[in-house]
């Protein structure tokens, strides 16, 4: 029997402030980004997960840093910063045979929750950024695939609050995330949307 879950690590106003400060940087400058993350008190991933707080946790996602809240952040100078804050997944003895998020510091999981709860967590973070930045430049929804990408174009970067397939599960599960994406990086990834491509090149 498949058990449905949604896990979340909240994005509060303080974290939004921190992310918007990072969005002012050149995300292709790995040294500057790393220095700002150290100033923010975001330890390196290996340092954090090697500490006592994670001693009894199962495998956690690989990243470059961990926020004080518990988010796993990837920012390695390629023009992006990726911060997942919610996961939608099943525990059925296949890919997962236990609820891995229940014991991860900063995260809570809800058994029996599914898309309405997952979408609500995403909408909450969208609203937090809307409160700071105003209405988004794009709000792209793909109902067939249950995805939504909301984006704001800033001077140097784009802020995206997105949801979609989670790559570490071979797209079996989904995540909701904040993505900072450089408008100048040559090899920065694009969402599968002409509107998103137009956003970045306009």
What residue spans do the PLM features occupy?
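Short helix/turn-capping signatures at newly exposed starts of structured segments
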Residues: 1-147, 154, 159, 164-202
């Amino acid at each position: 029997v498949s058990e449905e879950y949604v896990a979340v690590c909240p994005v509060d106003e303080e974290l939004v402030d921190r992310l918007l400060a990072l969005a002012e940087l050149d995300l292709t400058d790995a040294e500057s980004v790393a220095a700002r993350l150290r100033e923010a008190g975001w330890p390196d991933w290996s340092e954090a997960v090697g500490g006592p707080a994670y001693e009894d946790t199962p495998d956690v996602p690989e990243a470059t840093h961990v926020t004080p809240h518990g988010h796993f952040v990837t920012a390695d100078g390629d023009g992006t910063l990726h911060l997942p804050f919610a996961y939608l997944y099943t525990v059925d003895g296949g890919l997962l045979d236990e609820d891995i998020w229940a014991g991860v510091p900063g995260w809570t999981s809800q058994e029996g929750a599914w898309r309405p709860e997952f979408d609500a967590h995403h909408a909450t973070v969208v609203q937090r950024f809307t409160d700071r930045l105003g209405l988004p430049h794009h709000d792209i929804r793909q109902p067939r695939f249950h995805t939504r990408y909301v984006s704001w174009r800033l001077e140097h970067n784009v802020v995206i609050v997105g949801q979609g397939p989670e790559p570490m599960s071979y797209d079996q599960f989904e995540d909701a995330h904040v993505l900072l994406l450089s408008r100048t990086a040559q090899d920065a990834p694009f969402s599968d949307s002409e509107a998103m491509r137009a956003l970045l090149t306009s």
